[in-house]
């Protein structure tokens, strides 16, 4: 049996994740059967499940990757900027449909919910850290607790993702994001 380098294994794992993301986006979690995953990924079930023990772990790996990527952008630019980028460049955000699947599974699968909370914490921490940093710099309104602003922004994000992923009208979303940003910012110049 040939020896496979860690680099090669990592590349194969990434190929599986990219194919699985397309499959989950097109068919949803339930519709992404092992056969469909094999076809979309272009690898056998043995190859897929060598890297991921089951479909749920594969899906969670995607969710973890998405949360980490979003957390990076949030830490740098803020959650409203993430939403602006999603609106301007939907092709860069192939994970939108995956996020809707996550929402559905959170409601229906307690085991998944418990495992997902760990991954979501990465994004939550990035958003909270950014809000706290901006509050410290006097950029955030100070009449509302940071945790309330965090919940508010998360709620807006969930609705925003739902609208984009379901093909809803986006005509006024740029102005909505302006309104959201104005609603959390301090009225005093920093």
From Swiss-Prot:
It comes from the Bacteria. Pfam families: TetR_N. Keywords: DNA-binding, Magnesium, Metal-binding, Repressor, Transcription, Transcription regulation. One of its GO terms (biological process) is regulation of DNA-templated transcription. SUPFAM superfamilies: Homeodomain-like (SSF46689), Tetracyclin repressor-like, C-terminal domain (SSF48498). The keyword Transcription regulation applies. Residues 10-70 form the HTH tetR-type domain. Citrate binds at residues 79-80, 130, 134, 185. Mg(2+) binds at residue 181. GO terms for molecular function: DNA binding; DNA-binding transcription factor activity; magnesium ion binding; transcription cis-regulatory region binding. Gene3D superfamilies: Tetracycline Repressor, domain 2 (1.10.357.10). The keyword Transmembrane helix does not apply. Residues 33-52 bind DNA. AcnR negatively controls the expression of the aconitase gene acn. Homodimer. This is HTH-type transcriptional repressor AcnR. It comes from Corynebacterium diphtheriae (strain ATCC 700971 / NCTC 13129 / Biotype gravis). The gene is acnR.
